[in-house]
Amino acid sequence: MDLLTWLSLREGIGHRDDAAAAGFSPVRVRAAIRTGGVQRIRARWIALPSAPVELKRAAAAGGALTCVSLARRRKWWVPPEADDALHVHLPGHESIREGGLRAHWAKPLGPTRPRSLEASVEDALAHAAECFELDQATAIWESAIRTEAITLDSLQQVKWRSTAARRVAEHTRNDTGSSLETISHVRLSGWGVRLRFQVHLAGHDVDFVIGTHLIVQVDGWAYHSSSADRTRDIAHDAELRLRGYTVFRFSSAQIMYDWPSVERILIAAISRGAHLAPFRA
């Protein structure tokens, strides 16, 4: 196997110590660098020109991808307004060497893989808890649960060091189907009114029930794949109203970008007793 093939099997980037262990002498590595087939990154990393930019930048920074940058790479949900900076987990002795980086210097939560360019899932989630508001951080955590081979129980057993991470761990669930549902759930919690999630009523599940009779439906990002879906939802809402429920349906845009209006409507409904069973004389 030649050096280029070896690198291609490692996502295009590798540490020179690993290359040496694989039988590639410093002379062969330097020759590959001279011909332009391999790039040198700092003193100890080498990469193909086609290697992922974020990995090359992490190597150049002397750290590992973390927080929202690892979330993007591993295809977790990312808040639409998240910054474009590269978030890197750096050892305590490293400093930022280029612009466009966001450094996280916290001590790793557990042992780290030698020369890894990706922080552990736990460290990345801890950093996300520090970088984002509770609702968005919780959505990132729950997306990681859906994407990675981790469980809610395992996350809740981690000895989180920051108050922010412990708070997110308390709010994280494993039964939400989307990040939009997660954000809605976090924002609706803590009002001092009973909140239930994914309740089966009148033949179909509803997203949230506040109290006993106030229903909140959240239409997702890809709302309605067909007119039949829309017709079914309208019919279900009508049946719920006939049974005495108050039903509000909000779009993803309202939840994400106009939450104060959503909150105002729901608080007004609660103040009028819409969350309580209707009085029947």
What are these model-derived regions, one by one?
Residues M1-S162, V168, S271-A281:
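Short gly/ser-rich loop at a beta-strand->alpha-helix junction or flexible surface loop bordering the NTP-binding
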Residues A144-A281:
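Surface segments flanking catalytic/ligand-binding clefts of nucleic-acid enzymes
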